[in-house]
Amino acid sequence: MKKYLLGIGLILALIACKQNVSSLDEKNSVSVDLPGEMKVLVSKEKNKDGKYDLIATVDKLELKGTSDKNNGSGVLEGVKADKSKVKLTISDDLGQTTLEVFKEDGKTLVSKKVTSKDKSSTEEKFNEKGEVSEKIITRADGTRLEYTGIKSDGSGKAKEVLKGYVLEGTLTAEKTTLVVKEGTVTLSKNISKSGEVSVELNDTDSSAATKKTAAWNSGTSTLTITVNSKKTKDLVFTKENTITVQQYDSNGTKLEGSAVEITKLDEIKNALK
């Protein structure tokens, strides 16, 4: 009888050792919130290898992994029905997640999304050569830059989605240029690779009395428009990714009234008239 009980005990012990992350539930694990509105389950106890088991579900796919830490950080992996491989990397401080999808070989990237705690993210899609073909940069405030048709030289189409309207333009290896046209006037917003913004205005009007010129002040992020040597209005491109417009008095010497936030593309065009 004693040998029988010992045998049963040994079998149960072996079963326990073979248990993996698929057995995690609310009783034996802790749920940890992650950037990107994801969650990871972390085992309360270490497994037979002395590590904590991790489990997460992304787009209905279960990802599994282990970690030396019990805070939720680590690397989890899974395989889709089409045999493509998914890898989720959670930073040590839980402030960032990196979700990567690879082809069946596990090396060729298909897509990649890095999400931070402040809700900002960068999402990339790759072509057959492993080069970035599409990219979306989402800021913490929800505004975003979208790039499509990216070529090997870094050029492509660009779009900035702001609150209430969209600016469109082009991407080069050096910068993003977003353009708004109204009559003879072209307003260009340039964003460097480092994120620095500069704005310029070009007017093809041949009449000196109505031709618009503009000066950019990088310190205040303000474009001051002038007509016939008189300042007419200020366009301010704020750090909050909004644009405001404020008029000058008839003499062009001082601002009057209050700055008004632009919420429609037509309002930018009206400011260029």
UniProtKB/Swiss-Prot annotation:
Q: Which domain of life is it from?
A: Bacteria
Among its keywords, does the record have Membrane? Answer: yes
Listed InterPro entries:
OM_lipoprot_Borrelia, OM_lipoprot_dom_sf
Q: Does the keyword Hydrolase apply?
A: no
Lipid-attached positions, S-diacylglycerol cysteine: C17
Kindly indicate where the leader peptide sits in this chain.
1-16
Primary localization class, coarse: membrane
Question: By its UniProt entry, which PROSITE patterns does this protein fall under?
Answer: PROKAR_LIPOPROTEIN
Q: Which Pfam families match?
A: Lipoprotein_1
Q: Which UniProt keywords apply?
A: Cell outer membrane, Lipoprotein, Membrane, Palmitate, Plasmid, Signal
Q: What does this protein do?
A: Induces host (human and mouse) cytokine release by monocyte cell lines via TLR2 and CD14; nonlipidated protein does not stimulate host cells.
Of which family is this protein a member?
Belongs to the OspA lipoprotein family.
Protein name in UniProt: Outer surface protein A
> Which species expresses this protein natively?
Borreliella burgdorferi (strain ATCC 35210 / DSM 4680 / CIP 102532 / B31) (Borrelia burgdorferi)
Lineage of this protein's species? Answer: Bacteria, Pseudomonadati, Spirochaetota, Spirochaetia, Spirochaetales
Report the gene name. Answer: ospA
